[in-house]
Amino acid sequence: GYPVTIFEKEEKPGGMLVYGIPSFRLEKSVIEAEIEVLKAMGIEFKLGIEVGKDITLDDLRNEGYEAFYVAIGAQGSRKLNIPGEDNAMVESGIDFLRKVNKVEDPNLIFGDVVVVGGGNVAIDVARAALRSGAQKVHLCSLEQEGEMPASPEEVLEAKEEGILLHCGWGPKEILEDSIVFKQCVSVKDETGRFNPSYDDSVLETIQCSHVLLSIGQSIIPIQGLDVDVNPNGTIKAEGTTLQTSVEDVFVGGDVYTGPKFAIDAISHGKEAAESMHRFVHKGHSLTIGRDLHLFNEFDKNNALIDIDFDHAKRQIPGIKKGLGEKSFTDLRSTFTEEQVKIEANRCLGCGASIVDTNKCIGCGLCT
């Protein structure tokens, strides 16, 4: 029942779902439909306004806003800190994806492209480069293929599209028309921490016209947002309520956790909404009934239950034909109505119980 306003610095709402994920992974029409639902609910979008630059939180407080949710993501790019990184042909993968998502131009770039990184974002950058005019795309990662942070499905799709993998290599320097790599002997040290070691005597040089860096993301803070932050730039907040050191400011998504999945940010949004609802009603506890550790759930993993679960291989949607493998369109089909019913029927009998802390009275029936 609260009036809600979203301030967005870009010309379109949607954040990283719109500007950070290419259409062949997530169709823009899907996000646009969801945003139309939000508008129909009465949510106001103020676009092209950067909080901290065009308007401050104090300005908004003076206008009557009582609680704030900061979900600005991790839209910066980490640096390699190697010679030649300031070369004109070097660009961050995040900036490149933002450019691609704005225009989807098949002639955006030219020549051979090198993508540095091994995560899902690096795969997106490589596949987007292939669709944007690149002749060849080389994806270079520290990890061996089986150890890459990217999901195996994403890696397989990239290989099927012709992207060339160079696994076990770390960048040494960037030249005018090429990038030099040194062999990565190990990615982690004996304690399991990220601490790559190299053999500088084994080098590989790749000729290229563009170098796209996708080795991680960083936080670009809001000017004047005087909240406590962690050494890595993420905002500190209470784990259950997502309340920051400034009592009327709540936080969620990548700016709180560092780069994670979109569903994690969505989950934070729901929890923060509950916190803000309680916050504006003075005297209400932000924490009562919300700590899941206080609920003692039956340990099903160590119980002998004589139930025959469905362990059949899951259904895989088909592929759209006739659009070309280098199309910006998502080629994955959706489930048929019959398939949806089959999957939903499985959900009804999975045996898992989820505690809704807003409704649970501790009766124990779910166990």
Where are these regions (language model features)?
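Glycine-rich dinucleotide-binding loop and its adjacent helix/turn
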Residues: 36-53, 77-132, 229-246
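FAD-site-proximal beta/loop scaffold in flavoenzymes
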Residues: 86-110, 174, 189-260, 267, ...
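Feature captures the FAD/FMN-dependent oxidoreductase FAD-binding
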Residues: 32-82, 172-180, 185-187, 210-212, ...
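Residue-level detector of alpha-helix initiation sites
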Residues: 12, 119-121, 256, 365
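Rossmann-like dinucleotide-binding cores of NAD(P)H-dependent redox enzymes
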Residues: 6, 10-41, 45, 126-173, ...
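Mid-to-C-terminal Rossmann-like scaffold of FAD/NAD(P)H-dependent oxidoreductases
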Residues: 160-162, 170-173, 187-188, 281-349
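Cysteine-centered iron-sulfur cluster-binding motifs in ferredoxin-type domains/subunits
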Residues: 1, 254, 341-367
